[in-house]
Amino acid sequence: LDVLILCQGTVVYRRGEFEREGWDRVMAVNLDSLMHISRKFRAQLSQASGSIVIVSSISGLKANIGNPAYAASKAGAISLTKTLGQAFAADGIRVNGLAPGLVDTKLTKVTTQNAERLQGALAQIPQRRMGTPEDMAGAAIFLASPLASYVTGHTLIVDGGLSL
């Protein structure tokens, strides 16, 4: 196994993450599964001197109104990227991350399908556009490739300048 891309995520809207059930569900998908899957494929990745790319979110670096579990789980994913980058390096495995900004996905439909909300979101992004799957793929390919052979434990922010 050369590359393992971990790109799972869920969110609970309408303040559901403030309840135990919503919190636990989001944490299980967005954070716990990252560790479990990384551990499961560690030996295979080590045999190939492979690479893991953990997709988190810009929400892991800033507050996310109404979604505390989502923000905390993505912050945890960023920290896990650092920790696994250090822990797995001796096995020849590089672990890096990707923190997307606004990309049109199932999880962002609440914004992308509301013209007023979308306009407000785009106004905060210096490039004045959403990211695309191709934008994210390019960054992931770089992190997984030999071009990033001396990079581990780092999360690359790909957000059109939103975090500036």
Q: Where are each of the predicted segments found?
A:
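Substrate-binding pocket helix/loop in short-chain dehydrogenase/reductase
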Residues: R14-M27, A121
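Alpha-helical segment proximal to the catalytic Tyr-Lys
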Residues: A43, Q86-A90, S149
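Short, small/polar-rich loop/turn modules that mediate ligand/substrate recognition or access, typified
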Residues: S49, A89, R94, V151-G153
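C-terminal helical subdomain
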Residues: G97, E116-V151, G160
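Residue(s) in the substrate-gating loop at a strand-loop-helix junction
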Residues: S57
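Active-site helix of classical SDR
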Residues: S38, S73, T81
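Active-site loop immediately N-terminal to the catalytic Tyr-X3-Lys motif
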Residues: K62-P68, A90-D91, R128-R129, P146
